[in-house]
Curated annotation (Swiss-Prot):
Protein's gene: rplU
GO cellular component: cytoplasm; ribonucleoprotein complex; ribosome
Role summary: This protein binds to 23S rRNA in the presence of protein L20.
Subunit and partners: Part of the 50S ribosomal subunit. Contacts protein L20.
The entry's keywords: Ribonucleoprotein, Ribosomal protein, RNA-binding, rRNA-binding
Domain of life: Bacteria
Alphabetized HAMAP family for the sequence: Ribosomal_bL21 (MF_01363)
GO MF assignments: rRNA binding; structural constituent of ribosome
Disulfide bonds: none
Record protein name field: Large ribosomal subunit protein bL21
């Protein structure tokens, strides 16, 4: 059984036991997190939501918080001997799927 869920404006295909990386959530590591925006449940008889499947939820365990690859933002003003270099690392939350309720 699999489900397509929405988290942070993005869609993810999840199965029980899978680990997904979503944008940073305000949840403690080790706590339980419920994704209730389920767009579709597949495997056997498929259920498609309009826009969400009623009564469906995906429960996850928060595995931890990680940072993505570093990107460099460089602004240069030509002929002015002026520039600004700034780095950024996006925060992500890793979720381990523990159950899918249809």
């Amino acid at each position: 059984m699999y489900a397509i869920v929405m988290a942070g404006g993005k869609q993810y295909k999840v199965q029980e036991g899978a680990t997904i990386t979503v944008d940073l959530l305000a949840a403690e590591a080790g706590s339980e997190y419920v994704l209730d925006k389920v767009l579709m449940i597949g495997g056997g008889e498929a259920k498609i939501g309009a826009p969400y499947v009623a009564g469906a939820a995906v429960t996850c365990q928060v595995a931890g918080h990680v940072k993505g690859k570093k990107i460099v933002v460089f602004h240069k003003r030509r002929r002015k001997d002026s520039h600004k270099k700034q780095g950024h690392r996006q925060g992500y939350t890793q979720l381990k799927v523990t159950g899918i309720q249809a």
